[in-house]
């Protein structure tokens, strides 16, 4: 899961 809150990418899985 990566909503972009700790990374510059937003996947929203």
Swiss-Prot record:
GO MF terms, alphabetically ordered: hormone activity
GO cellular component: extracellular region
Keyword flag Secreted: yes
Record flagged with keyword Aminoacyl-tRNA synthetase: no
GO biological process: neuropeptide signaling pathway
Superkingdom classification of source: Eukaryota
Subcellular location: Secreted
Tissue: Brain. Appears to be mainly expressed in two pairs of bilaterally symmetrical cells in the protocerebrum.
UniProtKB keywords: Hormone, Neuropeptide, Secreted
Described function: Inhibitor of fluid secretion by Malpighian tubules. Uses cGMP as second messenger. May function as an antidiuretic hormone.
Name assigned to this protein: Antidiuretic factor B
Organism: Tenebrio molitor
């Amino acid at each position: 899961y990566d909503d972009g809150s700790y990374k510059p990418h937003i996947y929203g899985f």
